[in-house]
């Protein structure tokens, strides 16, 4: 009985190490590919929708702020206007 438990635990240990190694190998290939992927996604990060001129202050009207931000009149800074979506 003890021998079968030891053998079972040894097999489970070997399977765990094998699965972990396979996962690390797969994750490693993702990390090698990610810089190229990020460069191809560059146009998304530089879209017009994300360009904010007055994100942290200096606004005078709501149109100075980014989407979903509104100009707070007391301190003249952009803050969330409470809306969702595009």
Swiss-Prot record:
<feature type="disulfide bond">
    <location>
        <begin position="52"/>
        <end position="66"/>
    </location>
</feature>
<comment type="function">
    <text>This toxin acts as a voltage-dependent gating-modifier. It inhibits the sodium conductance (IC(50)=124 nM) and slows the fast inactivation (EC(50)=1180 nM) of Nav1.5/SCN5A. It significantly shifts the activation to more depolarized voltages and decreases the deactivation of Nav1.5 currents upon extreme depolarization, but only slightly affects voltage-dependence of steady-state inactivation. In addition, this toxin causes an approximately five-fold decrease in the rate of recovery from inactivation and an approximately 1.9-fold reduction in the closed-state inactivation rate.</text>
</comment>
<feature type="signal peptide">
    <location>
        <begin position="1"/>
        <end position="21"/>
    </location>
</feature>
<keyword id="KW-0964">Secreted</keyword>
<feature type="modified residue" description="Phenylalanine amide">
    <location>
        <position position="84"/>
    </location>
</feature>
<keyword id="KW-0027">Amidation</keyword>
<feature type="propeptide">
    <location>
        <begin position="22"/>
        <end position="50"/>
    </location>
</feature>
<keyword id="KW-0738">Voltage-gated sodium channel impairing toxin</keyword>
<comment type="similarity">
    <text>Belongs to the neurotoxin 10 (Hwtx-1) family. 28 (Jztx-11) subfamily.</text>
</comment>
<keyword id="KW-0632">Potassium channel impairing toxin</keyword>
<dbReference type="GO" id="GO:0017080">
    <property type="term" value="F:sodium channel regulator activity"/>
</dbReference>
<feature type="disulfide bond">
    <location>
        <begin position="59"/>
        <end position="71"/>
    </location>
</feature>
<keyword id="KW-1220">Voltage-gated potassium channel impairing toxin</keyword>
<keyword id="KW-0960">Knottin</keyword>
<dbReference type="GO" id="GO:0005576">
    <property type="term" value="C:extracellular region"/>
</dbReference>
<keyword id="KW-0732">Signal</keyword>
<dbReference type="GO" id="GO:0090729">
    <property type="term" value="F:toxin activity"/>
</dbReference>
<feature type="disulfide bond">
    <location>
        <begin position="65"/>
        <end position="78"/>
    </location>
</feature>
<protein>
    <recommendedName>
        <fullName>Kappa-theraphotoxin-Cg1a 2</fullName>
    </recommendedName>
</protein>
<dbReference type="GO" id="GO:0008200">
    <property type="term" value="F:ion channel inhibitor activity"/>
</dbReference>
<dbReference type="GO" id="GO:0015459">
    <property type="term" value="F:potassium channel regulator activity"/>
</dbReference>
<keyword id="KW-1015">Disulfide bond</keyword>
<dbReference type="InterPro" id="IPR011696">
    <property type="entry name" value="Huwentoxin-1"/>
</dbReference>
<dbReference type="Pfam" id="PF07740">
    <property type="entry name" value="Toxin_12"/>
</dbReference>
<keyword id="KW-0872">Ion channel impairing toxin</keyword>
<keyword id="KW-0800">Toxin</keyword>
């Amino acid at each position: 009985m003890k021998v079968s438990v030891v053998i079972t635990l040894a097999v489970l240990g070997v399977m765990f190490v094998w699965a972990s190694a396979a996962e690390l190998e797969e994750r490693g290939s993702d990390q090698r590919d990610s810089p190229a992927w990020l460069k191809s996604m560059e146009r998304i990060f530089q879209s017009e929708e994300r360009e904010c001129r007055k994100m942290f202050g200096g606004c005078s009207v709501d149109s100075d702020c980014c989407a979903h931000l509104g100009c707070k009149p007391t301190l003249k800074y952009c803050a969330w206007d409470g809306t969702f979506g595009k």
